[in-house]
Amino acid sequence: VIECQCFLLSVFIRNGDLVCRNQIFSSTAGTTTISDIVKSLESGKTVIIDTSRLMTQAELLIGSMIAGNTFWRYQKYKSEGVLEDKPIVSVVIEEAPRVLGSDSLQSGDNIYSTIAKEGRKFKIGLIAITQLTSVIPKEILANLNTKIILGNEMATERRAVIESACQDLSSDDQAISSLDIGEAIVSSTFTKFAVPVHFPKFDDLINLDAKEKKPEKIIFR
């Protein structure tokens, strides 16, 4: 089992030392990396973890370590009465069924399901991205207060989305299936009715921002 886990995490032992093929894990460096990331989140910064070079198991391990450390620290702040001074933290997880699917939760809750259920008490939210809503337990879906519904051609998944929506979308099955790129329906406990929205293309938005941004002034004294 240990050898299997080492393979999945791309680590092995060489001359008694821990070696990582993708240079992510180390026995001598990075002792404050997770703490530094959490501190950045506490200061209101956006932190993006690039896991494109990692296998799924390593990616989920790193994400769980960061999310867990943040959650436990915010729990501590609440008990100390200083949580109100901290910014809200949102944890984004892609391919959410990997950690929120029924199969993943057979042996009990993990940090992601815990945040989904209890995070709001500690100013931590979960943004779960998935095309397969049907494999996520209804208990978890019920705790996600806002759903941004994109187009989906799979009838099973549309039914799961409609059943978990905060408003009655039973007559919107066809509308959901025909949503185009950039179009969505927002269903939330914070709105009285579902709201259709349109998102601009990210590349166009960035290019527009770059054109409008004035060059920085340099003053020599």
Where are these regions (language model features)?
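P-loop NTPase motor domains
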Residues: 1-114, 184-188
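Preference for short coil/turn "hinge" residues that link or interrupt alpha-helices
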Residues: 17, 30, 47, 92, ...
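Conserved P-loop NTPase motor module
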Residues: 61, 180-221
